[in-house]
Amino acid sequence: MNTTLLIMAAGIGSRFGTGIKQLEPVDDAGHIIMDYSIHDAIGAGFNHVVFIIRKDIEKEFKEVIGDRIASICSAHNVTVDYAFQDINDIPGELPAGRTKPWGTGQAVLAAKDVIKTPFIVINADDYYGKEGFKAVYEYLVNGGKSCMAGFVLKNTLSDNGGVTRGICKMDENGNLTEVVETKNIVKTADGAEADGVVVDVNSLVSMNMWGLTPDFLDVLENGFKEFFEKEVPSNPQKAEYLIPIFIGELLEQGKMSVKVLKTNDTWYGMTYHEDVAAVKNSFKKMLADGVYKADLFSDL
């Protein structure tokens, strides 16, 4: 069965001060976090990769990773496509002065024409570990419609400051009922807290790793039209169409059911510039422990 890895990379270069964080090597061989995600997705069974980028970064993106990945993928019978997120690709007029991208919902819609199979969607600059890819792949190939990898909160915190996480509420069958966005979660001696309130570090959180089907894209497209009519007029410069928010609305309305698949892997991201060294050390340890080979793709 064909399945797609959809990588949201259109935000590249926009959130990191010096240098482009998504293209920062994390090991001595020059691999970036995206290499590891692609490796883990192919290892799990995904056989189509779609990069969502901006047209203005296409050249640099292909030089740093795209062309290299394309040749690795072709050696493993994995196809590669590009989709371009464009601020003008909207069901209405662009508000005067708007420069902010429209968010993850619009990013995924940009790939609508190249997604014909069940797919997993991830952030380009996050490391998710192998388990989530395997769990989502198994769920999708066995006929599941919508799922989300649930990470254990304590495995997603930063030593360098507070983070925002979507804490998941579920019913007794492990179906998502609500994602509660919780800001400024910091590590403490006993666990974690957000603005002085203790947070359960064993809660499951959403890190934007969703398993979905092409049918969802039609729903997402209709939602974008509605968002444009209802949200944009009152907040033309800042309104964003975000996947977790939209899915949360569908859950509330009983129009969607999402299975939460727990993963025990540690999530790594570069929220703060200081996180870079810690992330590199984590990869060094995984390589030393044999989780990955130095010649990354040689074990596929």
Segments predicted by a language model, with ranges:
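Glycine-rich N-terminal loop/short-helix segment of MobA-like nucleotidyltransferase
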Residues: 1-28, 44
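Conserved N-terminal catalytic core of the sugar/cofactor nucleotidyltransferase
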Residues: 1-7, 31-121, 128
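A short, conserved beta-strand element in the Rossmann-like catalytic core
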Residues: 13, 127-129
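Hydrophobic packing residues within well-ordered alpha-helices of enzyme cores
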Residues: 61-65, 136, 220, 279
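Conserved core of the sugar-phosphate nucleotidyltransferase
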Residues: 130-210, 214
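Catalytic beta-strand/loop signature of glycosyltransferases that borders the donor
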Residues: 204, 258-265
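A C-terminal functional module that forms or caps the active site or interfaces directly
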Residues: 221-256
